[in-house]
């Protein structure tokens, strides 16, 4: 699903390597952002975590998702940090596209 819908290259054994991500995408970062146990930010997911993926073209990836029947569960107005949208993976995990 992640390869087909989001275009993420997944190795045959299920791992995603991005050793050159910083060089390919200046300004990209790995962010670890713990939330309080009682947060509702992950809803409608009941999972304990969510992925936040920085993308080069939010409109383009949302169009790609729509081609595969995946519609955003939430979109946000533009803000200082960029544009965001939330989608759900088939296992019910929320993905924040940024």
Predicted features and spans:
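Core segments of cupin and vicinal oxygen chelate
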Residues: 1-31
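Short linear motifs in intrinsically disordered
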Residues: 5-9, 52-56, 74-77
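Vicinal oxygen chelate
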Residues: 13, 39-98
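Short secondary-structure boundary/capping segments
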Residues: 22-24, 40-43, 76
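A generic fold-level signal
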Residues: 27, 45-46, 79
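Short hydrophobic-acidic sequence motifs that mark active-site Asp/Glu residues
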Residues: 31, 50, 94
């Amino acid at each position: 699903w992640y390869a087909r819908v989001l275009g993420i290259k997944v190795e045959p054994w299920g791992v995603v390597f991005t050793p050159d991500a910083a060089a390919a995408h200046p300004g990209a970062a790995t962010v670890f952002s713990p939330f309080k146990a009682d947060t509702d930010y992950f809803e409608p997911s009941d999972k304990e975590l969510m992925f936040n993926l920085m993308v080069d073209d939010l409109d383009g990836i949302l169009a790609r998702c729509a081609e595969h029947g995946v519609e955003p569960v939430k979109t946000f107005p533009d803000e200082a940090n960029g544009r965001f949208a939330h989608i759900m993976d088939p296992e019910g995990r929320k993905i924040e596209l940024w």
